[in-house]
């Protein structure tokens, strides 16, 4: 994701002095909104834990692209900060997912239940990581999301900002539904592994 964002930034620098710069900005905004919007249905109907995290990355790439497309100093700063914040939060989340899938021997969300009671430490860290990646305050991604949204409103893009907030709410609802279901749902009747990581 960071490499893709770097590629967009390089192109942004190249076209910045051209007469088509405004068109390029609108193109980035369009791709950003599309990326966030298209991630939501896939998140809401997902059955695979790691694919769920992958579609979350699609949403976050949209946020970065959107910040670059707005084109103000504030939004670009927010986009650059979001690249760093996402890398930290998503790395932690994929690590937790690796431990969870190793313990339960499956990536199927429906078969992962009772994380907090089965692996208290891992379950707690998983919840924290999901809260972080969805931009819940006071975690780092909240800051970069807030900066980008603020840039939309201060640059006069009120409707766009309001729409993006609604999309963020959809992503948050989907991610937290799966997170809480896996963390506090009834324990499965069988366990395929006896790994005790996080107990």
How should these model regions be labeled?
Residues 1-186, 194:
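Hydrophobic transmembrane alpha-helices and their helix-loop junctions in integral membrane proteins
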Residues 197-199:
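Glycine- and aromatic-enriched alpha-helical transmembrane segments of multi-pass membrane proteins
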């Amino acid at each position: 994701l960071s490499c893709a964002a770097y590629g967009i930034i390089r192109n942004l620098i190249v076209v910045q002095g051209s007469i088509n710069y405004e068109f390029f900005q609108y193109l980035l905004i369009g791709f950003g909104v599309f990326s966030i919007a298209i991630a939501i249905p896939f998140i809401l109907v997902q059955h695979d834990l790691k694919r769920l995290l992958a579609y979350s990355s699609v949403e976050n790439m949209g946020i970065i692209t959107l910040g670059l497309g707005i084109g103000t100093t504030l939004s670009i700063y927010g986009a650059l900060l979001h690249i760093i914040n996402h890398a930290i939060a998503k790395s932690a989340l994929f690590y937790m997912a690796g431990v969870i899938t190793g313990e339960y021997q499956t990536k199927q969300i429906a078969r992962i239940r009772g994380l907090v009671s089965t692996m208290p430490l891992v379950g707690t860290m998983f919840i924290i990581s999901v809260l972080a990646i969805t931009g819940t305050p006071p975690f780092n991604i909240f800051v970069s999301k807030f900066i980008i949204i603020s840039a939309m409103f201060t640059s006069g893009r009120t409707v766009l900002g309001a729409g993006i907030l609604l999309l963020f709410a959809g992503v948050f609802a989907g991610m937290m539904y799966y997170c809480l279901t896996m963390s506090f749902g009834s324990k499965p009747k069988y366990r395929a592994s006896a790994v005790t990581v996080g107990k």
